[in-house]
Structure formats: structure tokens, C-alpha cells
A protein has these predicted regions:
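Acidic, S/T/G-rich, low-cysteine, solvent-exposed domains in lumenal/extracellular/periplasmic regions
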Residues: 1-227
Length: 227
């Protein structure tokens, strides 16, 4: 990205939880990449401190994604968590090209996940973005932004509800026009509110099992890249 151009043979650009803002050169390179009709896999873990990333947010905004909030998703439904750990959630997998086999099987597991906030349906339409929800945290989950609270039960400062944690966002760059032979140009962003599920992050301090090995996490990564 520092060269100002993403290689032509890069069909899917993977972005994992930016730790600092993109500079103008990198941001413009990504925008050019998007406008050429290529795809992004965006993996974002929970945000734990205030961030000022205008260029990162500018890229997300092209697909209707709002800036990530400070906080983490936790679960209260024992059937939607791993071994009594409310921070390791089992999101509901919705039927889609990426998740159809995962939805039929044992799903996926996310640790320290965050919610994906999108603009309104009307604003998505104005951006020419078509949304497909892939994964949702259950209706019994909650979003906690006060990390000093140690209890597993939902507190008065937590936000309860079902949260979007995986989505496919297809943006139309150029409309097809049969009269002049113009072909449609579209760019897809597949986005998840988690990135540890793609890594060797340990499930706990006492386990050699990694999050990547859980359930269908590996398949979700591969499907998202190949799609």
C-alpha cells in the first residue's frame, strides 16, 4: 500500500483490524482498487480505546459501514457460547453463498467480537450497496463498553439485542448499459466483527486449541476469500 498501488493480481485484499490510520497514499490506493471492481475481506476485532482513523472510516463508509464503537459482544444464552465463556459466542449463520454449508453444520465461534453498524437502507441504496447479512449474535447477547464491569450478567450500561457480526456488501461502481456495451463493475466487501477466528489465538490461557480450529472457522475464512 505504501507504493500507492495494489498489485493487479490481488483479487481479494484482506484488511485485519487497522492499528493506525491509513495514510493518503494507502487510502487512495484502496479506493482505486475498489473502483476497479475488486474485493475486500475486512476483519475487525473489538475496539478497546478511542480511535481517530478518518481514512480507515472513509473506506468503510464507501460500503455503508459506520466507525466501530468501543465495546465487546458477550452472550447470556449458554447454547450460544463455548463452554460457559460468554466472550466466545456462536453467532447465528444465515443462509447465503458463503455460509450455507456452515449454517447447516456447527456454525462458527467468535471470541471478543464487535458489532457492525450500517447506515440506513435508504443510505445503502444511495451508495448503490446491496447488503446480505451473514452472521448475527443472538437476541440474548449484549454489547459492553465498560470493561471495568466483571460480572457476566448484563448490566444497566450494557446494550442488549441482536447484533450484526458478519455481512457481504456489494457496491455497484458502474451500471451495465446494453446500448453502449458498458459492463457492470461491482466491488464486494465481506466484513466480520472479529479477526481472531483466522489466527492461532488460544481459546484460553490453559488450552492449546486455537480459535481458528473451532467449529467451521477455517471454512468461513476460505469461503470468504474464494467467493
Amino acid at each position: 500500500l505504501s507504493t500507492g498501488k495494489i498489485p493487479d493480481d490481488c483479487d481479494t485484499l484482506i484488511i485485519c483490524t487497522p492499528k493506525k490510520d491509513f495514510d493518503e497514499i494507502a487510502a487512495n490506493a484502496i479506493i482505486d482498487y475498489i473502483n476497479s471492481g475488486r474485493n475486500i475481506l475486512w476483519l475487525n476485532s473489538a475496539v478497546t480505546s478511542e480511535q481517530n482513523f478518518p481514512n480507515v472510516n472513509k473506506i468503510l463508509a464507501l460500503y455503508g459501514v459506520k466507525p466501530f464503537e468501543i465495546g465487546i459482544i458477550r452472550e447470556t444464552d449458554s447454547s450460544k457460547m463455548l463452554q460457559g465463556s460468554p466472550d466466545i459466542i456462536k453467532p447465528d449463520a444465515l443462509y447465503s453463498t458463503i455460509t450455507k454449508d456452515i449454517a447447516k453444520d456447527s456454525g462458527v465461534r467468535f471470541i471478543n467480537a464487535t458489532k457492525i453498524n450500517l447506515v440506513s437502507e435508504e443510505e445503502l441504496e444511495n451508495l448503490k450497496v446491496n447488503k446480505t447479512e451473514l452472521l448475527n449474535a443472538s437476541e440474548k447477547s449484549y454489547f459492553r463498553n465498560n470493561f471495568k464491569i466483571q460480572t457476566d450478567e448484563i448490566s444497566s450500561s450494557d446494550v442488549a439485542g441482536k447484533f450484526l457480526v458478519g455481512a457481504e456488501l456489494e457496491k455497484t461502481i458502474t451500471e451495465a448499459n446494453e446500448e453502449n456495451g458498458t459492463k457492470a463493475v461491482k466491488s464486494k466487501m465481506v466484513i466480520y466483527g472479529e479477526n481472531n477466528f483466522t489466527t492461532d489465538y488460544p481459546v484460553s490461557n490453559y488450552s492449546q486449541v486455537t480459535v481458528f480450529q473451532l467449529a467451521n472457522n477455517k471454512d468461513l475464512v476460505l469461503n470468504s476469500i474464494a467467493y
